[in-house]
Amino acid sequence: VMAVWAGLAGTAAAQNLLSPAEATVYEGDKLADEGAWCWFADPRALHYENASGTINSSYVGYIDVHGAVKAVQYDFLKGRRSEVLIRSYFQPDDHNNPTFLVLPDERVMIFYSRHTDEPCFYYRISQVPGDITTLGEEKKILTKDNTTYPSPFILSDDPEHIYLCWRGIRWHPTIARLSLPDENDEVQIDWGPYQMVQST
């Protein structure tokens, strides 16, 4: 609004339509008093609405100053905001924010890792479609190299697998293909990990 107001200042449109006293600026909503994220891992926030109309929620992940990995779920159908503790006392580093993936069965899978000091990723999966307040137990994906900045996705041409990108092998972009979770929410790396790019 401020940019629009500055661009219209002095014009007849601004004088007739807006005045500083009447202009409204959206201040935003605070998600967390002590939450942070970095832009290297995505999606840090996700909105999912299904075709049947039973799910319409947004998920925003962050890590707090005490190292707790958290997320806020806003359910637009119920008008309810819920803060979810994903993992406590993890590592107080804004590079450890969680990322989100909606699975084909509409459950939400959350990935997170420490900042490069463990060769693994952690994940949890909602037990109810679209509802991260129902997270299952923490699981681990072991790797042999550095892990940080998980970025999961599912390709429309390959809906039977999860692709996970991260900063890994020799600190370079790395990719692996995972199976979809089984009945115990376990996944397996069935291709990779491979380094995607060599920087100089």
PLM features: residue spans?
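Bacterial N-terminal signal peptides
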Residues: 1-9
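Extracellular, repeat-based ectodomains that mediate carbohydrate processing or recognition
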Residues: 16-200
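Signal peptide processing junction and immediate N-terminal pro/mature segment
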Residues: 10-15
